[in-house]
């Protein structure tokens, strides 16, 4: 009986996207060989590159290719070249948001960790940074105040006003809570749910539903924090957190705060999943057109995005572990791209990919 072949739709995009994606290909090759798994990839245009070649940021052929795949590995989109276009036709609005909507990607997972040896890049005090941290921010992506109706602006003069509506349904809260609890089971067994239940009706329901889901996961400890306290605690002692469960708005804020305290955005991957486990995986940073093509971009976020893909959509935990271990070992050996070299000697984008791929192949 032949082993299953996994199909990945690869969307390199713009800016540094293609060159960091090239390093992800090296990592997938190493995984194929070491773990004897069958992984095929098909590449499609997206973003500005798709506008230039096909006249649309998200061509129908790209969507069709993604529909045939088990997961999407996404690079980055956008750049000054396309900023003159109407907002809905620009790479970000015209590609990322429609992909999320089309595949019903309701959950966003953003890991943020401080890697050993990179404490100097953390903006927190040394006595806080030295404790390290490894946080997974689980954000609800399709509900809440960004999508609630009604929203709009009315009136003129002193009576001109604007309004947005925060709406959460029980099923939306329950399904994102289960993602957080399941994730905590694979980590350190702690979920901190973030809300504003002392003021907001939507947060009162959020806390109620999360608390009702918790007994299904007796091996996971649940605690609750108000959003204002959570932002303070994240600065005071990030090591206390494992999985942070957030609504759309609160997760938007906290996931960026988590990213910033690592001091190394080029290291951070993200995953967006639907209820079937289908996902889109991408670096948390942008397309960085100013450094594109110079072999100086940090490919680790793209490589770790591939690791998340293997773990969450393909169920290949051993391969994902091997990638993460190889990244750790490369950093511990002192290999740094320019963003982390601090003026010292730096390796290029391609060399960093080669180093990590070799560590995977060697058994890391």
From Swiss-Prot:
One annotated Gene Ontology cellular component of this protein: cytosol
Subcellular location(s) of the protein: Cytoplasm
Residues flagged as site, Important for catalysis: 146, 196
Residues that, per the record, bind NAD(+): 79-92, 286-298
One MF term in the entry's GO annotations: magnesium ion binding
Alphabetical GO biological process terms: L-leucine biosynthetic process
Subunit structure: Homodimer.
Entry's family note: Belongs to the isocitrate and isopropylmalate dehydrogenases family. LeuB type 1 subfamily.
Protein name: 3-isopropylmalate dehydrogenase
Upper classification of the organism: Bacteria, Pseudomonadati, Pseudomonadota, Gammaproteobacteria, Enterobacterales
